Amino acid sequence: MLSRTSVINKSRLTRTISVLALAFSLAACGGQEAQNNTSTGDATPGAATDTTASGPAKLDLGGKVSLTGAGASFPAPLYSRWFFDLNKKYPNLQINYQSVGSGAGVEQFTQGTVDFGASDVAMKDEEIQKVPADKGVLMLPMTAGSIVLAYNLPDVPELKLPRAVYTDILLGKIKSWNDPKIAAANPGAKLPNEPITVIYRSDGSGTTGVFTKHLSAISPEWKSKVGEGKTVNWPVGVGAKGNEGVTAQITQTPGSIGYVEYGYAKQNNLKYASLENKAGKFVVPTEESASKTLEAVTLPENLRAFITDPEGDESYPIVTYTWLLTAKKYSDPAKAKAIEAMIEYGLTEGQKNAAELGYVPLPANVAQKVAAAADAISPDYKIAIGSSNNTSAGAPQQGGNNQ
């Protein structure tokens, strides 16, 4: 792992990632205001207004409230930023989020050891059935992003990978960077005669779940030999824990390629491939191409959708929402109120941090659906996100796959 701590400041993440920073604890945030100049108290267009039960400048929780959460590493940099800034706005609310992977996050939420979980894959029916009936679960998409194939080839600034090529690399069938199939898609590229080292997630991972669901959708061979899931038996490669660990391993390993959330690659200056989409077009992962993908997907009423192989010439092929997991009912009224305030912040002021950190702001219609679902958690708080959130409402065309 990289040794220096990754710090979220006003405009960016520093260029080095560590597990410590991404498991960012806000228990000590009250004394760190001088280190972060981001203001979250001023009213801004699209942000929460005085229609909340407590008002935007004051959150009456009857004292200090601490929330604990655990789960996906995919949104961890963004959540860390949100929770840091939210603590500055409401010093009586402290949130500790541990980046442990989607699998562990779902498990800890189900067992009741945390107040909320996070997962890059919406919970399946069999997982929902394990949640205590008196608690229930809401799955709330809070942001979205691309999963990229980042690589370490110093002399190859750009790389195109056809669908059949990147699946064959991950299956171990293409073993060298100068393989004719890679060369054919990249004429003139200085592809080295070096072995390819695949880096994959060693922990239970929603990022892996999304990625392998896509691979299974486009490759019958992958589907039959490997399949999909938060953990799979990888045919080749080296495992690393978390998006943080995969990012570090790629950085340290010449000739490597691995899948990480776009923001991690962007903030750490990793190169990433253009991938061939369903329409046969090579698309570079950006906030814009991810937004194009989301515009082609209708999120159903239960807020669960799997985007496995999206339509559209401009769509990047591997994009996912990432979900916050909360109870429908909390026995502690103060925690219920705090959970709603946390969600409201994420849907309003927090969305403005999304593109900055490599994520995709929620379409306005999705933010409205999330607010409506979450507003039932506490009778003492009213989530207000305005008639138009500072997001880009898409024109939904294609339904997501429900489960």
Model-derived features: where do they sit?
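Flexible loop/hinge segments at secondary-structure junctions
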Residues: 30-403
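C-terminal motif of bacterial Sec signal peptides marking the signal peptidase cleavage site
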Residues: 25-28
